[in-house]
Every structure is written in C-alpha cells, then in structure tokens.
Amino acid sequence: MTEVVTALSEQARAKVNLTLRVIGRRVDGYHELESVVVFADCADGLTLAPGQDLSLDASGPRVTECGDNADNLVIKAARLLAELVPGLKTGGFSLDKQLPIAAGIGGGSADAAAALRLLARSNGIALDDPRLMEAAKRTGADVPVCVASASCIMGGIGEKLTPLPLPRLSAVMVNPRVGVPTKDVFAALGLKNGQLNVGVTDVVAAPAWPDRDAPLGEWIAALSAGVNDLEAPAKQVQPVVGEVIALLAACDGALLARMSGSGATCFAIFGSDAEAKAAAQAIQRAHPNWWVHAGTLS
C-alpha cells in the first residue's frame, strides 16, 4: 500500500524593526545591532512536500524579483541544516512570494526560517535545537529572529534574542517599489572595522519598556525615544525613503513613522485599524505602483 505523504505549510511573516541601533562594526566586519522587532500579518507562503529531492518552485507576484532558485535562502537554509543533521529528510518546497524583495522586512529571511520550521516538523526536530539555530545563523543575520517570529529585542549580529511582549499595533507598511541593498546602506553608514557608531556606546541603555497591557501612548513614547540608525544612509541610497516617511507621518492618526531594517519599507503606527485602513487607501490612490499594506504588528 502506497504511503500518502502530506504536504506541510508555514507562513513566512514580514519582520518589522520598530527601532534599530547600530552599536558599531566589529573587527570581523559584522555590525552589532540592537533592535525591537515585531512581525506583521502579511507573509509569504511556503509548502514542503516531504520525501522528494531538495528543490524549490516559486510563484506569486514577486517571483520575478527572487533571482535564481539556487540562490534562494530557502535552499541555503535547507542545505545548511542537512550538513548539521545527518540523514535529514528534505523535499520539494513551493514558495508563494507576496512580500517585496530587498525591502527591509526580512522577506527572504522569513522564507528561510519557514523552511527550517518545516524541516523541523517533518524530521521531529525541536525549534530550539542548537543545530537548527546554528543553521539559521549561518543562513543570515535576520533568520534566527524569524524562526520564532515573536516580538523581541534582537542584539549582537542577530543571534541574541530577548522576548519583549508588545500589544497588537495597528499599522500601515509602505514600500515604494525600489530596492535598497543592505550592503549599500551599511556602506553609506561608513563604519570601519572596529569602529563604534557616533553617539553610541558598547552598552545601549534600553528604556523601561511598558507592560503589554499599558496604554498605547506609553508604548509610542518608549518607541519614539528610539531611532533607526540606518534611515539617514538609506535616504542617501534612495531619497524616496524620506518621502515615504514624511507621507506616513502626515497621515491622520499616525502616532509614529519610521523605516524598517535597511529600507525601503517604512511603517506608521496608528491608534486604530480604521485610521490605518483609511491612510493606506489614501496612499495607494496617490501612489498606485507602491506596495501598501494596512494590518497589525505583534
């Protein structure tokens, strides 16, 4: 009797950096960061059909931006985990690419993390297995935080994760459909190996974060005390980033507007879903070619 193999599916939720401090650049060239990270309700979809040879089939509105399948982080993550777990059963991945590429919301990293979760499920591996987290770190700096896809403070080069319960936030995310390569933004930041960022010490004094159930105003005040150190260099690479932030900040009901990651996606937090939806509709009407999403961050 032929065994029926059931396909497994995961959502690869977009990552949003509510704050992002660049502490400095290590002597090995990696940048030390501290960032409050949350996840949006928009996502790519990833499915694994266990038992097949390792492969990737990509579709969706952003598929042409992905490049060759062999370079996709899904395949990279699977191969790295296979190196660490002898006898790992892989399979055929199907990616539904919905999120913008090179957008500062960890689309590729979220896809890779979803692949690791799928392989963990199909092989009986715990998500906190050191081998899985090692594969995540080797795949990319944003992959470890995307494995759990839970709000946290991310430190180091992405491997230090401290849970930070946040309330559900109404938000609008906007990408002007321009790519902002991370390497170009860090190059514009201009730190040399071993150099600290101006005005930042080795230890960043984090604010006393409110309780999850605290009034929204307390959270906005705490988040407003932070910054994204990559905003200024991203504006040098793509000036439209500044236009997007200004547009979001000017929307009725916007409480905080900022860039996520290394850009070009920016976000604004609103006091209600209705205000966020109205703002998103207005922005989409004015800029029909932009990617605009009204939803929640958590």
From Swiss-Prot:
Active site, UniProt feature: 15, 142
Annotated pathway: Isoprenoid biosynthesis; isopentenyl diphosphate biosynthesis via DXP pathway; isopentenyl diphosphate from 1-deoxy-D-xylulose 5-phosphate: step 3/6
Which cysteines form disulfides? none
Q: Which ranges of the sequence are coiled-coil?
A: none
Give the enzyme's EC designation: 2.7.1.148
Return the protein name. 4-diphosphocytidyl-2-C-methyl-D-erythritol kinase
A Pfam family it matches:
GHMP_kinases_C
What are the recorded GO MF terms, alphabetically?
Answer: 4-(cytidine 5'-diphospho)-2-C-methyl-D-erythritol kinase activity; ATP binding
Query: Which keywords are on file for this protein?
Result: ATP-binding, Isoprene biosynthesis, Kinase, Nucleotide-binding, Transferase
What the protein does comes down to: Catalyzes the phosphorylation of the position 2 hydroxy group of 4-diphosphocytidyl-2C-methyl-D-erythritol.
Query: GO BP, one example?
Result: terpenoid biosynthetic process
Q: Provide the taxonomic classification.
A: Bacteria, Pseudomonadati, Pseudomonadota, Alphaproteobacteria, Hyphomicrobiales
**What does the entry list as the binding residues for ATP?**
100-110
Could you say which protein family the record assigns here?
Belongs to the GHMP kinase family. IspE subfamily.
Q: What does the record give as the reaction this protein catalyses? A: 4-CDP-2-C-methyl-D-erythritol + ATP = 4-CDP-2-C-methyl-D-erythritol 2-phosphate + ADP + H(+)
What's the source species for this entry? Rhodopseudomonas palustris (strain BisA53)
PANTHER family associated with the record: 4-DIPHOSPHOCYTIDYL-2-C-METHYL-D-ERYTHRITOL KINASE, CHLOROPLASTIC (PTHR43527:SF2)
